[in-house]
Amino acid sequence: MRINCLLAVLGLAAASPACAQNSGWEGETGVFITPMAYTAPSTATGFGLPIVGYHYLYGGKVLGDFQEISIAGGGFQRWEFGYTRAFHNQGSVPSLSPLWHNGYNIFHSKFNLLPENASKKAWVPAISIGFILRTQVHDVGAAILDKSVTNGDVYIVATKTITQSKMVPIILSGGVRGTNAELWGMGGNTPNFQERAFGAVGFVFKGPAHTAFILASEFSQQPRHPSELPTAIIPTTITYAIRFVPTPERKINFDFGVAQIAGQIAPGVNLQARAQVAAQVSYGF
């Protein structure tokens, strides 16, 4: 299998309709929790077929379980757009778990400003801007106030696949987002709009029988305090993940990971979510 197709299979190079697809936690093309500058596959003059995904996070006995179902598409080799519905099963700690409620809507879009290797320069990364809008959020601060709120992100991200190390290509991605959401809405809103950095690194490996794997790690800074909880401190989220692509002929991949979310966030308040298991699967038509 050609290395550029392998990278596209993993969602770590310019995606091709012939290769498998991937979606991140909120449905956008990415890893687990961070978007990448690549967009969903499409033609230069029209739209591509959709990518669908299922995403699961075991948040622990305090936070409960989070699930998301997503659909996304691309257009004109530059544009990506999609919708995701978030679902939640409440945890089992009476003093804290009622702060999380079932479900909200996620709308997202991304536009590629600069394609990777533009002007035939191998050092040029892909650069994109995007937004994520969440509605009907009723978690944490919103639950305290007993009302649903809206929050969102705007971001710029650069992604580069380094293929000079042909045996193990390296993927670097990073950017800055402005957000008024804590933990992508799972922690409700924040008191104001804040700038936060994020990034990811991945290493691509060929497996047996034309399979492929990517080992990756991500970080995403979080706003310091959720709304209505000024003494609570939310740490940077870190993930460790593996993506498995069973075959280049099938547009499907599987992700498994561990997320460091939050533990003791305030005196007497422990979310018990420092090593949470997550999984997702995405399929491109």
Predicted regions and their residues:
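Repeated loop/turn-to-beta-strand initiation elements of outer-membrane beta-barrel proteins
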Residues: 51, 77-83, 115-120, 165-170, ...
